[in-house]
């Protein structure tokens, strides 16, 4: 028997099983346009998702034949309303991600507000908002996710406020509990306000508030405030041994704005990794430390070259690590602490990379006037800084004590002191070296 493919204008939206980490089908509520209203619904028992904003750049199905949708882009459509909904007994709860497209998905022109979503008794993951411009208020996630598929993962900046995460509740009575992670630190940039964490402890083998993940762009502006805890003392899961972590994973950081994590205002929760910790840090919280530092991202670009070899990361206090970039990425990245002279950071590159003849280095996700000293080792003898506003310091000590935006050559190394300019969490600086 032969079958004929239906015409596009009458075809149904695909509804077979689609497997992905950030989104999977089928979905109980399969939402192809953001301009819809969902109030007081319950989704249960899906092998895929409870609610999936699976938006394409252009309309599909029977909408193709309707002239009023001809210029509509569902992916960028205005947001309708979403409140007082529940998901239980589903493999995933909620996603605004496009299947197999990385951190991409529904991006409304105005901030989408998801209010009072409750998720319980779920599978390996719960909530994935892939793009920014979204806020979750009174989000409740319990008995959902596992150690490596966290209850909440966001590749782009979103806000979570007045919310609750419970690792294993009374629903787990009878030895049905499991190791869990509340929030996976992906590219991130998530603003956490007044969030309560319950039972992230050693029960059932250990559950963690935060879990480190690799990221194409390690966003370090992850502020948290008003954090409260109940039976919780495992803050951080590295997911790997320090020697097996890439720079984007060891740089997964949460900034504690008000001290509610325990060390003080303006401190940070970081991986227990030699490139992140120092004498300001506390004892271990799981596999993390609280440190009296603020951290920014340093990005190093060799004229867009991809397939970069590993680079050696150093600190002047004797610590070092080998940084393996993500495959086919056109930059190195490193997360560094700012505004001190206890040590500086250094990088040693492969000779084949240096053959490119230029290096552009930027500091990102900083505060205004943040400074950091970087050393580039084994540089060609004719290497110099070609950036307007940078001046040459007399020596290394003068550079470190100076106001920033200076450089100096010392032997085979070039030292630079960057100084960020801009708004809080969005300040930047950039310096170009050529040879």
Spans of features found by a protein language model:
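Acidic/polar low-complexity surface segments
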Residues: 1-31, 48-84, 91-109, 147-149, ...
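Feature marks extracellular polysaccharide-active and adherence modules
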Residues: 2-4, 31-32, 39, 44-49, ...
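Generic detector of short, locally flexible boundary/turn motifs and exposed helical patches
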Residues: 16-18, 125-129
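Intrinsically disordered, low-complexity serine/proline/glycine/threonine-rich regulatory regions
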Residues: 69, 99, 124, 131-435
């Amino acid at each position: 028997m032969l079958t004929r493919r239906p015409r596009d204008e009458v075809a149904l939206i695909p509804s077979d099983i689609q497997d992905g980490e950030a989104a999977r089908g089928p979905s109980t509520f399969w939402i192809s346009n953001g301009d819809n209203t969902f109030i007081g619904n319950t989704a249960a028992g899906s092998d895929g998702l409870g609610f999936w904003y699976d938006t394409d750049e252009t309309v599909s199905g029977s909408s193709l034949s309707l002239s009023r949708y001809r210029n509509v882009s569902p992916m960028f459509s205005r947001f309708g309303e979403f409140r007082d909904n529940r998901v239980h007994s589903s493999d995933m709860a909620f996603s605004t991600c496009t299947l197999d497209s990385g951190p991409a998905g529904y991006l409304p022109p105005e901030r989408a507000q998801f209010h009072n979503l409750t998720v319980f008794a779920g599978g390996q993951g719960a909530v994935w908002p892939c793009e920014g411009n979204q806020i979750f208020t009174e989000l409740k996630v319990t008995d959902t996710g596992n150690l490596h598929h966290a209850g909440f993962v966001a590749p782009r900046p979103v806000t979570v406020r007045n919310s609750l995460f419970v690792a294993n509740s009374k629903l787990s009575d009878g030895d049905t509990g499991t190791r869990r992670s509340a929030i996976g630190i992906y590219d991130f940039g998530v603003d956490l306000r007044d969030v309560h964490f319950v039972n992230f402890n050693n029960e059932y083998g250990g559950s963690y508030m935060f879990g480190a993940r690799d990221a194409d762009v390690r966003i370090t502006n992850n502020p948290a405030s008003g954090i409260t805890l109940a039976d919780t003392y495992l803050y951080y899961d590295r997911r790997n041994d320090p020697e097996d972590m890439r720079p984007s994973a060891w740089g997964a950081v949460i900034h504690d704005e008000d001290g509610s994590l325990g060390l003080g205002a303006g401190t940070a929760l970081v991986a227990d990794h030699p490139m992140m910790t120092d004498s300001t840090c506390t004892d271990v919280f799981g596999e993390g430390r609280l440190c009296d530092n603020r951290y920014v991202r340093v990005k190093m670009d060799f004229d867009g070259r991809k397939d970069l070899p590993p680079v050696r990361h150093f600190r002047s206090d004797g610590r070092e690590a080998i940084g393996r970039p993500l495959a086919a990425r056109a930059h190195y990245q490193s997360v560094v602490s700012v505004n001190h002279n206890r040590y500086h950071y250094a990088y040693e590159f492969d000779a084949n990379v240096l053959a490119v003849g230029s290096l552009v280095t930027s500091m990102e996700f900083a505060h205004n006037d943040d400074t950091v000293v970087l050393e580039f080792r084994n540089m060609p003898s004719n290497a110099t800084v070609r950036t307007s506003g940078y001046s040459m310091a007399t020596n290394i000590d003068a550079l470190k004590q100076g106001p920033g935006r200076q450089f100096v050559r010392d032997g085979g190394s070039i030292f630079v002191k960057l100084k960020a300019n801009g708004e809080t969490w969005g300040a930047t600086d950039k310096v170009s070296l050529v040879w």
